[in-house]
C-alpha cells in the first residue's frame, strides 16, 4: 500500500461530493453480498452489528453535515442517542432500537441528499471564516470517518460463518519478504540520534491528535525494514508454546486460518496479524528486541517496507502532543488519552489509502486481537 502524501490543493464542492460518493460506494459494496439477517446479527461483544455501523455512519453525517453545517433539524428526532459511540458500548448496541433493513437504507439516502443540498451553499475556501468549513475540513472528516468504519466492519466480517469475500479482501497489499533457513531475518535500518519532525503539517486534513507538528529528540535506534511474518511467529510459538493468533487452528503439522467463512493454509510469508499488544511485546522480548516508539516509527516510515499488511503495535501510550488543541470535538481523541490505550502505526490491508498517512495515529486497548494488528521490531542503536 502506498502511504498517503501531504495534500497541497484545496478541495472543491465537486471533489468533496465525489469523495463522499466513493466512500459510500465502498461501504455498500462491503455489505452487498449480505442479507438483512447478517447485517442485524451480533457476532461478538467486541464489535457492533453491521446495521449499527451503517446507521452510525449516516447519523454522524447528519449531525455534522446537515445539523451543524446546515442548521437543519434531524430526520428522526432523538435517534442520534442510539448511535452515540461513547454512550453506547459495543456489547449493548445489538439491543438498541436502531433502524434496520429498508428503513435504514432510506435513512442513509435521505441524509446524503440533504448533505449535498447543504454543500452547495457553504464556503469551503482556504480563507473561509469557519474553521470547520475551511478547506472542507468537516467533509474530509466525514469521509475519513466512513472509511475507518469500513475497516471496523471488515473486522466483523472476519467472524462470518458463511463464505464471503469482498473485492477489498482480494487485493494483495503485502509483498512477501525473503526468509532464509534460520527464519525471517529482515534488514535493520539505522537512524542516528537527532531531531526529527513529528506530526501533520498545518495544510491538508489531519485529526487533532496528529497536530501540532513538532520536533522530537530521539536516541539512535534500529528498526526492521519489514514487519514480522507468520513464519517467524510460528517459530516463536514452537519455542515458547505461545497461543496462536486469532482465527488460527492446527491442521496436522501446519496451521490454517478461518476468516470470512473460508479456511485456508496460513501463508508463512505474510505479516502476522490479529495479535494483541501484549503478544507483540512478548514476541519482541523473545526476539531480543522491542517494539518501536511511535516517534521512531514515524521518523523511519519513508524507508519501511511492507506497510499496509497489518497495523503495527508501538510501545507508546496514546497521549496528546505538546500544544494539542481538541478540534472539532473532544470525543475523537481527548477521552482516549492516557495510559490505557496503545498507539498503532501504518495501515492494514483493510485500511483505505486516504487514512494511511505516516502521521495517522491509530490506538486500541492492549488486549484487543480482532483488529488487523501485527508488529515490527526495533532496538537501541548498537
Question: Can you annotate each of these PLM segments?
Answer:
Residues 1-32, 36:
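Generic start-of-chain signal for non-secretory N-termini
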Residues 65-94, 110-130, 221-298:
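Active-site microenvironments of metalloenzymes and redox enzymes
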Residues 191, 196-197, 223, 272, ...:
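Bulky hydrophobic/aromatic "packing anchor" residues in well-ordered structure
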Residues 211-214, 241-246, 305-382:
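Surface-exposed recognition segments
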Amino acid at each position: 500500500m502506498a502511504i498517503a502524501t501531504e495534500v497541497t490543493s484545496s478541495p472543491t464542492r465537486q471533489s468533496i461530493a465525489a469523495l463522499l460518493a466513493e466512500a459510500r460506494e465502498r461501504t455498500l459494496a462491503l455489505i452487498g453480498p449480505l442479507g438483512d439477517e447478517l447485517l442485524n446479527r451480533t457476532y461478538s461483544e467486541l464489535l457492533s452489528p453491521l446495521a449499527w455501523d451503517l446507521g452510525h455512519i449516516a447519523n454522524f453525517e447528519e449531525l455534522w453535515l446537515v445539523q451543524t453545517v446546515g442548521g437543519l433539524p434531524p430526520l428522526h428526532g432523538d435517534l442520534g442517542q442510539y448511535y452515540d459511540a461513547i454512550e453506547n458500548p459495543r456489547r449493548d448496541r445489538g439491543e438498541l432500537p436502531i433502524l434496520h433493513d429498508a428503513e435504514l437504507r432510506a435513512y442513509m439516502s435521505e441524509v446524503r441528499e440533504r448533505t449535498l443540498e447543504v454543500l452547495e451553499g457553504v464556503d469551503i475556501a482556504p480563507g473561509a471564516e469557519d474553521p470547520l468549513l475551511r478547506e472542507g475540513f468537516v467533509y474530509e472528516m466525514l469521509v475519513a470517518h466512513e472509511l475507518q468504519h469500513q475497516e471496523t466492519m471488515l473486522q466483523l466480517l472476519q467472524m462470518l460463518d458463511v463464505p464471503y469475500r469482498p473485492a477489498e479482501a482480494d487485493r494483495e497489499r503485502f509483498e512477501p519478504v525473503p526468509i532464509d533457513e534460520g527464519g525471517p531475518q529482515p534488514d535493520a535500518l539505522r537512524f542516528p540520534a537527532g531531531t526529527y519532525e513529528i506530526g501533520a503539517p498545518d495544510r491538508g486534513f489531519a485529526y487533532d491528535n496528529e497536530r501540532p507538528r513538532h520536533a522530537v529528540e530521539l536516541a539512535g535506534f534500529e528498526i526492521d525494514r519489514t514487519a514480522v511474518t507468520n513464519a517467524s511467529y510460528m517459530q516463536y510459538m514452537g519455542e515458547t508454546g505461545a497461543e496462536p493468533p486469532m482465527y488460527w487452528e492446527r491442521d496436522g503439522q501446519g496451521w490454517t486460518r478461518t476468516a470470512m467463512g473460508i479456511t485456508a493454509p496460513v501463508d508463512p510469508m505474510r505479516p502476522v496479524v490479529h495479535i494483541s499488544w501484549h503478544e507483540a511485546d512478548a514476541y519482541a522480548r523473545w526476539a531480543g528486541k522491542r517494539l518501536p516508539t511511535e516517534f521512531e516509527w514515524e521518523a523511519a516510515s519513508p524507508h519501511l517496507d511492507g506497510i499496509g499488511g497489518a497495523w503495527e503495535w508501538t510501545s507508546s501510550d496514546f497521549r496528546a502532543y505538546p500544544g494539542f488543541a481538541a478540534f472539532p470535538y473532544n470525543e475523537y481523541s481527548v477521552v482516549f488519552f492516557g495510559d490505557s490505550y496503545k498507539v498503532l502505526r501504518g495501515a492494514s490491508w483493510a485500511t483505505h489509502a486516504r487514512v494511511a498517512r505516516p502521521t495517522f495515529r491509530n490506538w486500541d486497548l492492549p488486549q484487543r486481537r480482532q483488529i488487523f494488528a501485527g508488529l515490527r521490531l526495533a532496538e537501541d542503536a548498537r
